[in-house]
Regions:
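N-terminal donor/sugar-recognition subdomains of glycan-related enzymes
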Residues: 1-165, 172-188, 199-202, 218-230, ...
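Short, basic, glycine/proline-bearing loop/turn elements
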Residues: 5-9, 163-167, 207-208, 259-270, ...
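Structural motif
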Residues: 9-14, 165-169, 190-192, 211, ...
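Glycine-rich phosphate/pyrophosphate-binding loops
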Residues: 35, 196-197, 204-214, 285-309
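Short, acidic/turn-prone active-site loops that include or flank metal/cofactor-
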Residues: 35-40, 194-197, 212-219, 236-240, ...
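Short acidic, glycine/serine/threonine-rich loops at helix termini
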Residues: 45-46, 178-179, 202-205, 212, ...
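Active-site/ligand-binding-proximal alpha/beta "capping" segment
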Residues: 241-300
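Phosphate-binding loop/pocket of nucleotide- and phosphate-handling active sites
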Residues: 307-355
Length: 471
């Protein structure tokens, strides 16, 4: 308590007799208690009633030996009231007994938390440049989005119409799967990450959906074949403007995020695009109700020759952009030794495992990559076995859904502009209020005499009101 005044959460190794835990819970919003032996949780709970604290989310009990502990920690640390304070993280130990006899284990718990905190915050750009750029793209893409195919029309016409999907990524293992993919392309709906598109086209394979979320224009190189008139290009609202303008047969989709939902453009949302394009493909397949999702080319690792991508990748099999990222070892597909990956791919893998674990009641995920890193919460099965087992029926053929009428899209654009104008007015008001408070605080600090308590209380209340209005 002395070290953590006003901390919103605390992590403690060891439940002990639970009396200390119950008393500490009164002082924190969340208390995370770690143990390596679930029997100790059971014993403690049999002596002290923590039911109220557990039900309210005051106390979380974490078994560090549980198979899904990484997923649990990612969910917990990604909560809004946790994420903002992760820099305060520290693992405390319940008592001297735990420190003396469980030293290795509580260090393991500490490392587990540190690892998952890094995954949660890794994509946060401290300068916010990426966030601002993506938001800028959103604002500029809105007119094109309103003229594109509404995402909700795609769902209403195609959801739950077929069970089998193949998600194609551009990893080194893809090349060996292409002949079989071509043979079975009429018996599975194909979701293709943009980087794999040219490789499929060279083999005469036409994907049903092509996904993209690049905020840079590097992906322009993937879409050079303008003869493809049947694939539906599903783009994130933050996709680079050049690509949005370049592509036909497109649906520009809003992310499943309050920032985007507040515009009330519900016909064009909402989906979890994730932070890499294959994640987008999986969430799109889930949104469309597919029950069996087969993945190929999802290596998330270098192959034995050091290749980062499949043969025929537009930027080369050994893409230079992958060589500057710090590397590490990961368990290989089917548990056959280890493979070399890097921290970005490893983060992607963990986030995919999170996605698959959260959706295992909705779909079965088959990893038919036959290479690369092992991905938990998937069934590893050869691509040939997947095809023979699941792909027995012809997939349905669909016409491309229609866009909104020009009259309706124009009306939505007018409403959107009105909303943005209100946002600008509010932003100016917040800025003016912030500058006024800053001036007052600077004046207070510059005084060499004690100011009246009533005045200071009023300033404090103004700061509290300002913070509340930001929430």
């Amino acid at each position: 308590l002395e070290k953590t005044p006003r901390y919103p959460f605390v992590c403690i190794y060891g439940i002990g007799n639970a009396l200390l835990i119950k008393n500490l819970a009164k002082h924190y919003k969340h208390l995370f208690v770690f143990e390596s032996e679930i029997e100790l949780f059971i014993l403690a709970l049999s002596t002290i009633d923590l039911s109220e604290e557990l039900c309210s989310g005051k106390i979380y009990l974490v078994d560090i030996e549980e198979e899904r502990v990484d997923i649990q920690l990612l969910i917990l640390f990604d909560m809004k009231d946790m994420f903002e304070y992760l820099s305060l993280y520290e693992m405390f130990v319940n008592n001297v007994y735990y420190k003396k006899f469980y030293e290795d284990i509580w260090h393991k718990a500490d490392e587990l938390c540190e690892k998952n905190i890094k995954v949660v915050i890794r994509n946060l750009n401290s300068s916010l440049c990426i966030g601002f750029e993506c938001y800028s793209h959103l604002l500029q893409n809105i007119p094109s989005m309103l003229e594109s195919i509404p995402f909700q029309r795609i769902l209403s016409q195609r959801k739950n119409k077929f069970e089998n999907a193949i998600v194609v990524s551009a990893g080194p293992s893809l090349t060996k799967q292409l002949p079989l993919l071509k043979a079975y392309q009429d018996k599975a709906v194909i979701f293709c990450a943009d980087g794999a598109l040219s490789m499929l086209e060279k083999e005469g394979i036409v994907p049903d959906y092509v996904t993209n979320l690049d905020f840079t224009d590097l992906a322009m190189k993937f879409f050079q074949n303008k003869e493809n008139k049947t694939s539906l290009n599903v783009l994130s609202c933050a996709t680079h403007l050049s690509l949005v303008h370049f592509l036909d047969n497109k649906s520009v989709v809003l992310r499943d995020d309050p920032l985007y939902q507040r515009f009330n453009l519900n016909d064009f949302g909402y989906i979890d695009t994730g932070t890499h394009v294959s994640h987008f493909s999986y969430t799109l397949a889930l949104a469309l109700g597919f029950k069996n999702i087969i993945m190929i080319g999802q290596d998330l690792a270098f192959d034995e020759e050091g290749n980062s991508h499949s043969k025929g990748f537009s930027y080369g099999e050994q893409f230079n952009g992958e060589k500057t990222v710090p590397t590490l070892k990961a368990q290989a597909y089917a548990g056959k030794g280890e493979v070399l990956t890097h921290i970005t791919w490893n983060d992607y893998r963990i986030k995919l495992e999170y996605l698959f674990a959260c959706n295992e009641q909705k779909a079965k995920f088959y990893n038919a990559t036959e290479g690369g890193a092992r991905i938990n919460f998937t069934e590893e099965l050869s691509f040939k076995e997947c095809c023979e087992k699941l792909l027995t029926k012809e997939k349905p053929q669909f016409e491309l859904p229609k866009s909104l009428t020009k009259n309706r899209s124009d009306k939505l654009l007018v409403k959107f502009k009105e909303k943005i104008q209100k946002d600008q007015d509010n932003a100016k008001r917040f800025l003016d209020d912030a500058l006024a408070l800053k001036q007052i605080l600077e004046n207070i600090l510059s005084k060499d005499f004690i100011l009246p308590l009533e005045f200071l209380e009023k300033v404090y209340q103004n700061i509290e009101n300002f913070n509340h209005s930001l929430d």
